[in-house]
C-alpha cells in the first residue's frame, strides 16, 4: 500500500511539473511560450487557411507573430516540419477592405506589436518568404493557395 501511494504521488508531481510546458498541446503540435503551433502542408487561400485553423482546434487561428523570438520559432517549425519548402507560408495578418495600411489586429484579435516587413512591401494578405528563411513578411494575393501555420 505504501509503495502504491509513493508511486501515485510521484506521478502527480510529474503531471504537475509538465503542466503548461507543452504537454497540453495536441499530438503533432509544438509549444512556445504557452501557445501551440503546427505547420500544415495543405494548399489553401488565406481565408480558407484561417477557417481551417479555427475549425481544427479550439481557439485556433493563423499564427500571430508578436516577437523576434516567436518569429525564429515559427521559421524553425516550418523548416523542420515541411517536407517541401514552398516559397511562401500564410500568417494571420491581412488588410481588410480597401485600406492601404496594415490592419491593426491579427486574425486572433491580438494587436500588432511586432513587425518584420520586407522593405517596400505593401500590406494585403501576409506570408513568410522562403528567401528570408521564413523570417520576413511579404504581401501576397489573398487567393493564392499556399501552406500555413496555425496557432492555438
Swiss-Prot record:
Organs and tissues of expression: Expressed by the venom gland.
MF annotations from Gene Ontology: metal ion binding; toxin activity
Ranges where the C-type lectin domain occurs: 32-151
Signal sequence interval, chain numbering: 1-23
Superkingdom of origin: Eukaryota
InterPro entries hit by this protein: C-type_lectin-like (IPR001304), C-type_lectin-like/link_sf (IPR016186), C-type_lectin/snaclec_domain (IPR050111), C-type_lectin_CS (IPR018378), CTDL_fold (IPR016187)
Keyword annotations: Blood coagulation cascade inhibiting toxin, Calcium, Disulfide bond, Hemostasis impairing toxin, Metal-binding, Secreted, Signal, Toxin
Disulfide bonds, paired cysteine numbers: 25-36, 53-150, 125-142
A single Gene Ontology CC term: extracellular region
Binding site for Ca(2+): 64, 66, 70, 151
SMART domains with a match to the protein in the record: CLECT
Keyword Signal among record annotations: yes
Main location class: secreted
Note: Calcium is required for ligand binding.
Membership in a protein family: Belongs to the snaclec family.
Entry function: Anticoagulant protein which binds to the gamma-carboxyglutamic acid-domain regions of factors IX (F9) and factor X (F10) in the presence of calcium with a 1 to 1 stoichiometry.
Subunit structure: Heterodimer of subunits A and B; disulfide-linked.
Protein known as: Snaclec coagulation factor IX/factor X-binding protein subunit A
Origin species: Trimeresurus stejnegeri (Chinese green tree viper)
